């Protein structure tokens, strides 16, 4: 098998490793004084989306994290990180609250995709994702999204229409899973590795395509030096973004470039 083909899917499998730090691990180690807020104020809550208030060094921020858990016992009540409409609407409520109180927003993304069950469709999963995208596009406060492991389809994008998109070196970002792609295109699960390579879903691919703005090295992943470095990087970037009077306009322009094959910057 082609080494490049097998390599892309190997990175996907590594990103799915249950031992990798999850959203709650980042909240506990990067931020301080975290206060979790519950409910979408429309009648539901979703434990797969953890959100609330915290300090990043001395800066009050709103944190939104997709949480999988590590063990099967932890993952089942959190739907293995597949966020339901109630979770995205909770995130929407906290985004609007952040806008009202002038707090930057940090999103931690780790999902194979949004919830796709019958109840999710009945409760408006598509609309919930669309509302988040609309809200993120118009926020006047700085917003940074970090893909910490899996970044699957619209479920990830719903928390990633942001000023900066960072990816851990071992994360991936894709419109569809390699398994789903192989099934749709070729009806052949044996071509999953080939699909992974075709999707250009690794962090290196995303940076080259300017879908991601920064790759975070995984040296000391899950250890204090790693979290300390990330905290410092976030604080510095929020300070820079907070001084930009054209934040919303630049965010809009960044995403409007996607799919523009005539762009002369070499991204597409």
Regions found by a protein language model. Give the residues of each.
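Catalytic-center loop of serine/cysteine hydrolases
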Residues: 178, 188-189
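Terminal-region recognition feature
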Residues: 1-183, 197-268
